[in-house]
Amino acid sequence: VLDNVMIGALSRTKAVEAARRDAEEIVEFLGMTGKKDALAGSLRVHELKRLEIAKALATKPKLLLLDEPMAGMNVVEQGRLISVLKRVHDAGTTLLVVEHVMHAVVNLCEHVTVMNSGQKIVEGGTREVLANEEVIRIYLGEEDKC
């Protein structure tokens, strides 16, 4: 795990010791210290996702793009990842998230854009957008069609 995160850090510095220190800080920040010597292939899905985020953070991005980060996770694992992503955001990284898991959207996002079939439907504050009648109709369906 640590070596994988170092690869991200080495993309911005050639100083191996500095990359190692940065990687260790990120591994600790993401709660993966107990796995730092583990092989990536031995990790579970939620741990692999955290590793991918750690590698990205090692590049010190201002903006982190995440495509379906909750995919393949159970509710408990999703909750842990939501907590991690909140900490990433609180540390100063802007998150752009494509996600269909609504409790993740509600807990992570301040601003939401809803799309359907490639078309923007509505954009605005999270609670306002999720209360939009068209959004509800598109994602939950109409009563008479159930």
Which stretches of residues belong to each language-model region?
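Glycine-rich phosphate-binding loops of nucleotide-dependent enzymes
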Residues: 1-146
